[in-house]
Amino acid sequence: MTSSAMDNNEPKVLEMVYDATILPEGSSMDPNIMDCINRHINMCIQRTYSSSIIAILNRFLTMNKDELNNTQCHIIKEFMTYEQMAIDHYGEYVNAILYQIRKRPNQHHTIDLFKKIKRTPYDTFKVDPVEFVKKVIGFVSILNKYKPVYSYVLYENVLYDEFKCFINYVETKYF
C-alpha cells in the first residue's frame, strides 16, 4: 500500500486521533497539554503528511501493557523497541525525571531532551532526526507507563522537520 493509497479523509483521521487520546477513567489531562497536542496534529494535517502515522503513535502512547503484548501491528511493535534506545541514550536522566514526577505528581514538568550531535566529514555537525525522534518516542513511552499524560513531551521536543523525516521513514518501511 502506498502512502497515496492511504485513507487521509480528514474527519475520519481526526476522529481516530481524538479517540486514541482517551485516558482511563479517573485520569485527567491538562487542557494546555491537549492544546499543544491538537496544535501539532492540526499542523501535521495542514502540511499534508500522514496523520494516520500520528494516530498510530498517539494510540501507542496510550496503550496499556496487555494491549501492547497482544498487538499485531508491526508499527507498534517497532515503537516498542524505542524504549530501550531511550534508556541507552538518556540513561540516568530517565530515572531523574521519573523521580521528579513521583515527587510532584500534580505539577506540569518541563522536560527538555538533548540531541546527540554527529560530526560530518566536512567538520560540521548534524543530528540524525529519525534516531532522535525514535529516542523521544521511547522516552515518552516510559513516562506514559507511569501516568498516561506525558505525550506532550514528544510534541515539545520534536521539530516539524524532524517529525516529517520520521513519518517518511515509517511510511517507506511499512507502506
From Swiss-Prot:
GO biological process: symbiont-mediated suppression of host cytoplasmic pattern recognition receptor signaling pathway via inhibition of IRF3 activity
Classification via InterPro entries: Poxvirus_Bcl-2-like
Entry GO CC: host cell nucleus
Stimuli inducing this protein: Expressed in the early phase of the viral replicative cycle.
Subcellular localization, as worded in the UniProt entry: Host nucleus
One Pfam family, short name: Poxv_Bcl-2-like
Entry keyword DNA damage: no
Protein role: Plays a role in the inhibition of host innate immune response. Within the host nucleus, inhibits activation of interferon-beta promoter by inhibiting IRF3 activation.
Family indicated by similarity: Belongs to the poxviridae OPG036 family.
Name this protein carries in UniProt: Protein OPG036
Gene name of the record: OPG036
